[in-house]
């Protein structure tokens, strides 16, 4: 399974006084990366661990604005659905055979850990990787799918994302603390990231 690794920032970094952009968002991938390399980065990188802890502290302090800013400006991200030449869905150069189930805004870290374990053990989904999201209140799971099921690659990816998200929402009892939780809505684009 191969995908693209993008370095931060995901959004422009602006000067807090003037509002001028001081660093544009990263739009081209740093490199192609394997699933094994993603796992190693998540589990072994002390730098990433420190950055993630900083992001999580903002969540724990209830500062959503700081959390989003830190997540967008400091964390690398991958495109589990495949390799991209640019950060746009029409820049997919090769599908990975993976889709991402992305559940955010759970009520607690304990609920996120429980859901992560449930997803990882699911015999229908059979994720190859499941991890807690940067906030600590969400889960990301990389799910394999049949590349040949639908001839159109983008449609195949989108339909598999939609199916997997609907399945997870129907089968698992998780509680979102957001009334209008768009992050948990199925059907996002193929360039959907799996932020570390």
Predicted regions and their residues:
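Catalytic phosphate/metal-binding cores of nucleic-acid and nucleotide-processing enzymes, i.e., regions
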Residues: 120-124, 162-163, 169-172
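Flexible helix-coil linker/hinge segments at domain or subdomain boundaries
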Residues: 165-196
């Amino acid at each position: 399974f191969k995908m693209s690794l993008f370095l931060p920032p995901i959004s422009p970094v602006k000067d807090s006084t003037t509002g001028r952009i001081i660093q544009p968002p990263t739009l081209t991938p740093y490199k192609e990366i394997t699933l094994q390399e993603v796992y190693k980065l998540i589990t072994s990188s002390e730098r990433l661990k420190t950055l993630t802890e900083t992001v999580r502290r903002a969540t724990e302090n209830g500062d959503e604005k700081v959390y989003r800013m830190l997540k967008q400006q400091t964390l690398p991200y991958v495109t589990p659905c495949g390799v991209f030449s640019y950060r746009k869905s029409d820049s997919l150069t090769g599908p990975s055979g993976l889709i991402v189930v992305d559940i955010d805004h759970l009520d607690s870290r304990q609920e996120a850990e429980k859901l992560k374990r449930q997803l990882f053990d699911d015999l229908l989904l059979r994720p190859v990787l499941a991890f807690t999201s940067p906030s600590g209140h969400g889960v990301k799971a990389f799910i394999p799918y049949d590349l040949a099921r639908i001839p159109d690659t983008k449609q195949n990816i989108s339909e598999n994302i939609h199916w997997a998200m609907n399945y997870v929402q129907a089968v698992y009892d998780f509680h979102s603390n957001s009334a209008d939780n768009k992050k948990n809505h199925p059907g996002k684009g193929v360039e959907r990231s799996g932020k570390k």
